[in-house]
């Protein structure tokens, strides 16, 4: 799995607009502003999982509902049976949505699986989604396959250029400070 430090360094190098940082699921910032974005790990800070479990991305566009990306195509409100953890993301997205007045505070998410279950490139997928404009309503990558996930993963790994494998870093090792 790509480390928090690697994801944060990459986002800073490409000057990702609105970048807040990389967080464990129980340490996401409360002071979200319109235009902010972040990557979070399903694992909380003190759950004993050294490298975390799975990266997801969250974006908070100005004047719009919050957006959530999971490379496996799962929504933020589901209990993750694969990882065996509850998702804190539904409540967080609702609390920090910047939907216009009259529009209920809500969120959207991608419903398409892009990543193979056999790879650990979820962090790279999150970066690609954030750099691609954070759209959850249309296909952000027309050239990617909806069936050949291994090919997709190889392609996103080459595009982002980060390694994918065991990491000495814990997800909470990097925050938004600084």
Model-derived features with residue positions:
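Cysteine protease catalytic domains with a Cys-His-Asp triad
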Residues: 1-57, 61-66
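Acidic-enriched, low-complexity/disordered segments with a strong bias for Aspartate over Glutamate
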Residues: 8-9, 26, 30-31, 36, ...
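Intrinsic-disorder/low-complexity coil detector
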Residues: 23, 28, 60, 75, ...
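Catalytic-core signature of thiol
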Residues: 104-114, 131-178
């Amino acid at each position: 799995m790509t480390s928090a430090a690697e994801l944060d360094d990459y986002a800073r190098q490409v000057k990702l607009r609105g970048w807040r940082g990389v967080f464990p699921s129980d340490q996401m910032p409360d002071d979200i502003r319109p235009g902010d974005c972040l990557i979070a790990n399903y694992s909380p800070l003190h759950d004993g999982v050294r490298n975390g479990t799975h990266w997801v991305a969250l974006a908070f566009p100005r004047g719009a509902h919050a957006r959530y990306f999971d490379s496996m195509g799962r929504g933020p409100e589901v209990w993750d049976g694969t990882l065996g953890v509850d998702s804190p993301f539904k409540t967080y997205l609702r609390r920090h949505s910047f939907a216009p007045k009259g529009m209920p505070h809500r969120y959207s998410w991608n419903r398409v699986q892009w990543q193979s279950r056999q790879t650990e490139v979820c962090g790279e997928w999150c970066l690609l989604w954030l750099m691609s404009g954070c759209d959850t309503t249309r296909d952000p990558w027309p050239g990617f396959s909806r069936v050949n996930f291994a090919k997709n993963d190889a392609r996103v790994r080459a595009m982002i250029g980060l390694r994918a494998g065991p990491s000495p870093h814990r997800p909470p090792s990097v925050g938004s400070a600084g």
